[in-house]
Every structure is written in structure tokens, then in C-alpha cells.
Amino acid sequence: MEQKPSKVECGSDPEENSARSPDGKRKRKNGQCSLKTSMSGYIPSYLDKDEQCVVCGDKATGYHYRCITCEGCKGFFRRTIQKNLHPTYSCKYDSCCVIDKITRNQCQLCRFKKCIAVGMAMDLVLDDSKRVAKRKLIEQNRERRRKEEMIRSLQQRPEPTPEEWDLIHVATEAHRSTNAQGSHWKQRRKFLPDDIGQSPIVSMPDGDKVDLEAFSEFTKIITPAITRVVDFAKKLPMFSELPCEDQIILLKGCCMEIMSLRAAVRYDPESDTLTLSGEMAVKREQLKNGGLGVVSDAIFELGKSLSAFNLDDTEVALLQAVLLMSTDRSGLLCVDKIEKSQEAYLLAFEHYVNHRKHNIPHFWPKLLMKEREVQSSILYKGAAAEGRPGGSLGVHPEGQQLLGMHVVQGPQVRQLEQQLGEAGSLRGPVLQHQSPKSPQQRLLELLHRSGILHARAVCGEDDSSEAGSLTSSDEDPEVCEDAAQATQPLPEAPPRADGEGGGGGS
């Protein structure tokens, strides 16, 4: 007698049950366990505990096509509509199958009819193009909410207090009054001719070469730039209140860093140049061959990274103050006082950044990282230069001379002048040599006698002056002219973001 086929053979869903083994019960049991395990994670909060699918009675995972269903019935309904499969479904038992989580894969037609009966909407099933468009819209909404959240968080961040505004005004005025060419540096700059600094001609003892013509050009502008850094520091009350010994140590430590920062914020990506002292635009190789060595690479890379920040004069000024009041300089006497001063500038800096409301995500921590890069690039960029004179800086000795890296005081200056045979004519920050008439000394002597080297006094003392007194630019016509050009208004409380990026300069 012919056996009546069981309901299990009625058209099953090949996508859900394609790997059935001959032992149907065992396979279904494993499938149920797998589904239960995979769906045991996130459950929407609007569902009751252990709420069941309205189609098959399995554990529901949310609203799908207007009904509370499980993942299996959601997928079955979506595939059926997208591929237009329901006209091909059939039932061997007159559409009388009972659909539950055990039998749901045994009859596609009855399962689909139950989906329709409980209210699942066919019009909510999207084709591939509509589904892609919907996902894109979802991503756009998420991005919009993220930006709105960022704006709300910016509005809630603290802005400068009245006391901090006073600190900000002083630092900004100190920077602008010692900032050559001000915000007009692009209009007033002159490009160093391409033939200068491109062909190193003087060999150094360490094997590197220096272009004397480029070195001569840098000498003319870097020496006044050092004086401007000193003048900037002296205009900060917190700095002026420190002992002279600490002032000297801080200036020796930060001079190169501040000058590098002032040059970096005047990086021009169009010409790939840095503008030194607000007047001379130089290329990377020109700066390198002029005596700065590998440090020039660090300054150019810093300029490229800072160009995206669009810093204004106040932000450059506060960043310089943070670099100046650094407690990691060895030999400081008033470490606690300097640390408190730096914290005050850091807090004012952070609040001013909040006030400007930059559109760059995480602007403040990123800017602090750049501040550390200024220091680390100067301290460690040249570490790979094996045993180069000038230590880990990677700066040639004559480059250190120009940048005021090693400042010696009055009696030492006169002693070195006598060693060079030019007593009384060489002043200011000079390189402290280990022995008379070293190769580096002979090069300095050659440069000085050629009229190339002319250093200003930045920090010195003699028998007739107060010990450790710092020279001022009050009588320097060049610096006075620079100060007269600083006509931009200081930021008000709250100030208007003046926005011309790259406000700093040597």
C-alpha cells in the first residue's frame, strides 16, 4: 500500500534548510540551537521578556515589516518578496499546515500566508537599490546627530574667565609686538633665490656641508629673531617675576622651539616654503644647507601639520607661553612657580580654544600633541645623526651659534673673543667650545672675519651691568618698527576670532 507522504516533505525553504541531513529531527534541533544561540544577544527594550514571534512562536527579536517576529521569519518574508517566490509556493495538504518553530521550514506557502495574515507588509520590503539608499540615509542621519552632539558639547565647554582674558590679552600683545611683519607676511615676504642654499660648498668636520651664502642670509634675520623671542618672554609678567637664573635657563631651552613654531605657522603649502622672520621664504634644502641640518625637516613637517589648524595670533602666543614655561629644563630654581604658570597658560589656552569653536574633532588634544612635537622634534630629530657636533639636535655648531642654543655670559664671551683674535667685536649668544681653535672655532673665525657673522647680545653680563640682565629691544629700530606694525586689535572678552591662520612668525 502506498504510504501517504508526511508533511515534512512539503516544499521546504532551501535557504533555511539547505543542509538537512537524513535525520531531519536531529538537524532541526541543531538548527534551533544555533538560531537560539545567535539571537541570544541584543533584544530591543520595547519587547517583553521572552516575547514570541507572531508567525512561528520562536523568540522574537523586534518589529519587522510591521509585526513582531523572529529573525527567521523576517528573512523568509524578505526573500520571498524580493525574489517574487510566493507564486511558486504550493502545499500538498490544502493549505492547512500548522506553522510553529518546528514546522515553519516544511511548508513555504502556509508560512507565507501566515505572515500575511498576522499583518506583515509586503510594501515595506525594499529592493536592493532602495535598501542601499535607506542605509545611506541612516548613515547621514548618524553623521548629523554626531555633529549636533559635538556642537552641544562645544557649547557646554568652559570659556575663559575674566582673569584668564587678562592673561590672554597680555600674551597676545607680547606676541604681536614682537612679531615681524604681523599678519602681512605673505605680502611682504621675499623668496630666497633658488641658486642660494642648493649647492653646499664648505665641508664640515662631521662630513656634512654648509652653503656659506645661505648661512650669511640666515645670519642677518635669525639674530634679530632671537632678540624678539627674548622680548616676548620679558613682556610676560609671570616670566619677569622669576629669578634671572631661571629666566636664562628657560630662554636657552625654548628659544629654538619658539623660533621653530613661529616659522612653522608661516608654512605655505603652495610654494612649500617657510617664511623666516616674516620676510624671507626658504625651501627645505636651503634651510638644511644653511646650517640647520635635519632639524629643518622637523620644522617643515610641523608646518605642514599645523596648516590644518588655522591658528590665530592668540593661539600662537599662548602656545609660545606654554613652551616657555616648561619645567623639564634642568637647573631650574623655582620649579613649582614655573609649573603653576604653565598650568595657568594651559588652562587659558584650553578655554580660548573652546571659545573659538574649531570644527576639527578633538582639536584641543591634537593641538597639545603638536605642542609636544615642537619640543620633541628639536630634542630628538637629530638623534640619528651619529655623533654629530651639536648633540642630539642635529644642528651644525654654527647653526647653534645663530639660534642661540648655548648662551654664555659676559666673561666667557670675552674669553672666547680673545681665542678668536677678535676681542670686543663678537657679542651675544655664542657657542661654548671645548678647546681653543677647534675646527668649529676656525670656521666661526673665518665667517666673522668675512663679515658674515654678526650676533646680537641676547643674554649677557659684564662688570658694569647687573648680573644676568637681559637686553631689551626698546632701542632697536628694527624691533620697534615691527612693534609699530602690530596694529591688529587684541581679542575682546569674548573676542572675535580674527582667523587669519599662521599669525605667528620669527
UniProtKB/Swiss-Prot annotation:
One of its GO terms (cellular component) is RNA polymerase II transcription regulator complex. Nuclear hormone receptor that can act as a repressor or activator of transcription. High affinity receptor for thyroid hormones, including triiodothyronine and thyroxine. It comes from Sus scrofa. A zinc finger (NR C4-type) spans 53-73, 91-115. This is Thyroid hormone receptor alpha. The keyword Transcription applies. Residues 163-407 form the NR LBD domain. CDD domains: NR_DBD_TR (cd06961), NR_LBD_TR (cd06935).
